[in-house]
Amino acid sequence: MRKIIHIDMDCYFAAVEMRDFPEYRGKPLAVGGSSDRRGVISTCSYEARKFGVRSAMATAYAFKLCPDLILVPGRMQVYKDVSLQIREIFSRYTQLVEPLSLDEAYLDVSECQQYKGSATLIAQAIRRDILAETGLTASAGIAPVKFLAKVASDLNKPNGQYVITPETLPEFVKTLSLRKIPGVGKVTAEKLSSLGLNTCGDVQAYSKPELLARFGKFGGVLIERSQGIDERGISADRERKSVGVETTLAKDIYSLEQCQQVMPGLIQELALRLSRSAKERKIHKQVVKLKFNDFKQTTIEHRSDEVSIVMFYDLLAQAMARQEGRGIRLLGISVGLADSILAVSEIPNAQTQLDLAL
């Protein structure tokens, strides 16, 4: 049986700010963009969360919930540097580390001999090292499988940990909400609920052939996860799946022509990001995303192994057909990256294609 730890830093960006600027401690603090420029909250302190402030919330709305909110701009390089410190700590215990973002990661400690191989004690040691060396707290989840380790890391926050053992796993998953399963979003959850399926226990008792008939391949995944089965390993060499860029607009715009004026800057920035992080990766799709002023969003994608600037504009026009009179507050473009890395001589890479097009 594997021993998986999910480490999740507590309100990471905000915690770094409170560490470096003690005057923010104990106060409602948020890191994000300004309210007069359509900014959003990246993360916030637990004091701010008591007022209902949350990540990805519009900054203007956050101030309505918490008028005394302290808003600071992000210092991304600082957060990256601290994240590297944390990853160095991980490497003392295992090389099987799968970073999910700057502030969370999966670790497989199945072969770790420290602390007599106890994943519980290893997680405690990692959290202790992080606190001693960075001044920041982390929470941890320990389980035999990945998705349950992630669920567990959220159960004793902040600065705590929760263990799901092979013995307690069957009872734990029975009462687990299906919303906790990766891939079950709001729409899928509503479909499942209409069938009387709200917990993993409900799925366990439901007809498997009917689930497969209704949900196809995902039905099979749902059946496995509801039994606590997750065979996915730790991707220590995990490659990014996409590169994108988006902009939140200072004011809502309403016409296709206005959106088209935003595109050249996005395309240039995308080319720059590709040159930095995916120089020789082959693409497999292009995507355009719009977020409307009612905070709903739509995405249009086109599968292709070549970047086409014209296609980005075509996808934009298709997305605008879903506007229904709403204002546009965010516009983004991205490319999906294929798993294989081919030599430049075999196929023009995405960044080169964009340079040629520009």
Curated annotation (Swiss-Prot):
Disulfide bonds: none annotated. It comes from the Bacteria. The active site is at E104. Keywords: Cytoplasm, DNA damage, DNA repair, DNA replication, DNA-binding, DNA-directed DNA polymerase, Magnesium, Metal-binding, Mutator protein, Nucleotidyltransferase, Transferase. PROSITE patterns: UMUC. Mg(2+) binds at D8, D103. GO terms for biological process: DNA-templated DNA replication; error-prone translesion synthesis; SOS response. One of its GO terms (cellular component) is cytosol. Binds 2 magnesium ions per subunit. InterPro entries: DNA/RNA_pol_sf, DNA_pol_Y-fam_lit_finger_sf, DNA_pol_Y-fam_little_finger, DNA_polymerase-Y, DNApol_IV, IMS_HHH_1, Rev_trsase/Diguanyl_cyclase, UmuC. Its EC number is 2.7.7.7. GO terms for molecular function: damaged DNA binding; DNA-directed DNA polymerase activity; magnesium ion binding. It holds the Pfam family IMS_C. It catalyses: DNA(n) + a 2'-deoxyribonucleoside 5'-triphosphate = DNA(n+1) + diphosphate. Residues 4-185 form the UmuC domain. The record marks F13 as: Substrate discrimination. It is found in: Cytoplasm. Its cofactor is Mg(2+). Belongs to the DNA polymerase type-Y family. Poorly processive, error-prone DNA polymerase involved in untargeted mutagenesis. Copies undamaged DNA at stalled replication forks, which arise in vivo from mismatched or misaligned primer ends. These misaligned primers can be extended by PolIV. Exhibits no 3'-5' exonuclease (proofreading) activity. May be involved in translesional synthesis, in conjunction with the beta clamp from PolIII. Monomer. This is DNA polymerase IV. The gene is dinB.
